[in-house]
Amino acid sequence: MFPAKGPSLGAGRARMLTARLLVGSAGMSLLRFTFLGTSAAQPTIHRNLSGLAVKADAELLLFDCGEGSQRQMIRYGTGFSVDAVFFTHFHADHYLGIIGFLRTLGMMGREHGLTLYGPAPAKRLLRQAVHLGVEAVGFPLEILELQDKDRVARPGYTVRAVGVQHRINALGYVLEEDERAGRFNLEAARALGVREGPDFGRLQRGEAVVALSGKTVQPGDVVGPARPGRRLVLSGDTRPCEAMVAAARDADVLIHEATFSDDEQQRALETRHSTAREAGRVARSAGARRLILTHLSSRHDTDPSRLLAQARAEYTGPLEVAHDGMSVEVPLRD
């Protein structure tokens, strides 16, 4: 059994925060993420500090923004049209890159607003960061604090905060696509005399139509059951915990920190991080469909093979160790 979650977050009631956008409900076509940084605590020649860029259809999100993230965005071609930034916690290696990033956005002439999300004390720390580059930040900036179970609704998907176990107040995140419409049975629609064209679209939107015969055709006559959306889960910095197991249940991808190896177990306990074996155990317990390890100690910078082997001892599904620039597209579920 894993501990439930960290002591720093009160249970509270879940809140739904709706982004100031037209929020749709038809899911997404594209879900792709790119690792901007995969190193723990300090950068190396090969690995930058924590950062993940997620492309969700037309939207671009950042999860953490370690020092040097904006250069990585240039290097890996993610673009700078970021719609929101989500911070897992406020250790320096996860957020100091926001200072230069905001300044660059201002110098690029950005005019539309940007929202920064994170656990308390997000407002205090991020305001301080903004002030360091204030002479060039000329666009609306909103800072919102999240807690366990809070949800942020965005077009076609929701981002949910998960309270985890770290040395300070920390969150993991679940990006969950809205349910997608069931499959449209073209042959059944034609057999029922449904007019091709707009009536097909109405049925797919859940509206009844009148067939050529005069009979009313219900959506359930030609549209299959709704299909579950994709789920991308990011642990952030954490000890293995039941909250992350629950969050990653049947996830398409679980990105879990794996700072240490087995022989560094005591260090993992002291610093409130996970070993690769523990990350594998979380993925197995959750039934995650794919596990990607990240946030590696510099000791494993160029040769993460031990981490991979130790995670493999616990988890038999698709397994990789992330590297900077690694880009993954999450396929649609059947």
Language-model segments: residues:
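Active-site neighborhood of divalent metal-dependent phosphoester bond hydrolases
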Residues: 110-145, 299
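Short, electropositive alpha-helical surface patch
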Residues: 229, 303-324
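Conserved beta-strand hairpin/beta-sheet module of binuclear metal-dependent hydrolase folds
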Residues: 28-78, 113, 173-175, 182, ...
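Metal-dependent phosphodiesterase/nuclease catalytic metal-binding core
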Residues: 53, 147-293, 304-309, 331-334
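Residue-identity detector for glycine
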Residues: 6, 10-12, 24-27
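A short helix->loop->beta-strand "cap" motif at the edges of active sites that frequently abuts
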Residues: 110-114, 286-290, 317
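Active-site metal-binding motif and surrounding structural segment of the metallo-beta-lactamase
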Residues: 67-117, 145
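Active-site neighborhood of phospho(di)ester-bond hydrolases with catalytic His/Asp-centered motifs
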Residues: 63-66, 83-90, 119, 233-238, ...
